[in-house]
Swiss-Prot record:
Belongs to the prokaryotic/mitochondrial release factor family. InterPro entries: PCRF (IPR005139), Pep_chain_release_fac_I (IPR000352), Pep_chain_release_fac_I_sf (IPR045853), Prokaryotic/Mito_RF (IPR050057), RF-1 (IPR004373). The gene is prfA. Its main location: cytoplasm. Residues 280-303 are annotated as: Disordered. The modification N5-methylglutamine is found at Q231. GO terms for molecular function: translation release factor activity, codon specific. One of its GO terms (cellular component) is cytoplasm. It is found in: Cytoplasm. The keyword Acetylation does not apply. It comes from the Bacteria. It comes from Campylobacter jejuni (strain RM1221). The keyword Protein biosynthesis applies. This is Peptide chain release factor 1.
Length: 355
């Protein structure tokens, strides 16, 4: 019974209330912070649980009044409303009971690379960057470019952006994978549709405590920054290339104004990549069914097609097709795709948890 599953949450919440008012905890900032965070995380399920249990009590009270000559009709109407509310609350509670992704509230690094298709792929990276920037603005996220390499005719060969905002990972994690684009290039005189592809990697930002890097495992090179076409953009050795020797991961950053700033940014990206590698290894050890709930997020997995001649965008993980590609790209309306993906993910998780 669902009500019995809620009891531990209610008891723990009351326990936390008592602990947070005790002098021992008040005088211990570290414990106070930890327990306050736990209480905040429990609050949504506790509030919904109390509403649900109150609804169950009200249902029983109104059932007892059905044969009352004065209150029977009123109880019947009230009971109808409560019986409709009960399953809605149950579904909301089941969603809240699902295991939380520990990365969901983090900022993210969004790494986009041009793949097959040459210049067309680079141009689409540029278009997608603009669309993601609008999406970030819509949701109140802050977006900053960490590093970039421009394409020869525009757009980007590759770009790394930091997206800051509560829940950024919880939504944009669904963007990881291969994005295929079909459109007629401006240089195409015959009107033929060309197909190109880009890859998106979504990496949660991590702190120093979570990822420790031995300085002896790093090779740090400094060089002149180069701009569009390879020309030097300044006369100082400000660009930084960091190689993590054990894994072979290489990060280059030249967008900052100083060597120190570029090294700091490159280290953040390196930590995110190492964390992503660890997470991928962990996921690989779990069951394939769980890994493929909405798609693995592997950058080699083709997740979406953007067909410009048909104004069509298709997400292959959930067989979703929308004929409003122009609006989605122009206004950054990715929630029209992300929301169905979240719903699908939750349905799969509910089935797995037998809720």
């Amino acid at each position: 019974m669902l009500a019995s599953k809620l009891d531990p949450f209610l008891k723990r919440f009351e326990e936390l209330n008592s602990l947070l008012s005790s002098s021992d905890i008040i005088n211990d900032i570290s414990k106070m912070t930890t327990l306050s965070k736990e209480q905040k995380n429990l609050e949504p399920i506790v509030l919904k649980a109390k509403e649900y249990l109150k609804t169950l009590d009200n249902i029983e009270e109104n059932k007892a009044l059905l044969n009352d000559p004065e209150l029977g009709e009123l109880a019947k109407e009230e009971l109808k409303t409560l019986e409709e509310l009960k399953p809605k609350l149950e579904e909301e509670i089941k969603i809240l009971l699902l295991p939380k992704d520990p990365n969901d509230e983090r900022n993210i690094f969004l790494e986009i690379r041009a793949g097959a298709g040459g210049d067309e792929a680079s141009l689409f990276v540029g278009d997608l960057v603009k669309a993601y920037a609008r999406y970030a603005e819509n949701r109140g996220y802050k977006l900053e470019i960490v590093s970039s390499s421009e394409g020869s005719v525009g757009g980007f060969k590759e770009i790394i952006m930091l997206v800051k905002g509560t829940g950024a990972y919880s939504r944009l994690k669904y963007e990881g994978g291969t994005h295929r684009v079909q459109r007629v290039p401006q240089t195409e005189s015959q009107g033929r549709v060309h197909t190109s592809a880009i890859t998106v990697a979504v990496m949660p930002e991590v702190d120093d405590i979570e990822i420790e890097i031995n300085p002896n495992d790093l090779k740090v090179d400094v060089m002149r920054s180069s701009g569009h076409g390879g020309q030097s953009v300044n006369t100082t050795d400000s660009a930084v290339r960091i190689t993590h020797i054990p894994t072979g991961i290489v990060v280059v950053n030249q967008d900052g104004k100083s060597q120190h700033k570029n090294k700091e940014s490159a280290m953040k990206v390196l930590k995110a990549r190492l964390y992503e590698m660890q997470e991928s290894e962990r996921l690989a050890k779990e069951s394939e069914a769980r890994k493929s709930q909405v798609g693995s997020g592997d950058r080699s997995e083709r997740i979406r097609t953007y067909n410009f001649p048909q104004n069509r965008i298709s997400d292959h993980r959930i067989n979703l097709t929308l004929y409003r590609l122009d609006a989605i790209m122009q206004d950054g309306l990715f929630d029209e795709i992300i929301e169905p993906l979240i719903t699908h993910h939750q349905a799969q998780a509910l089935q797995e948890q037998n809720l």
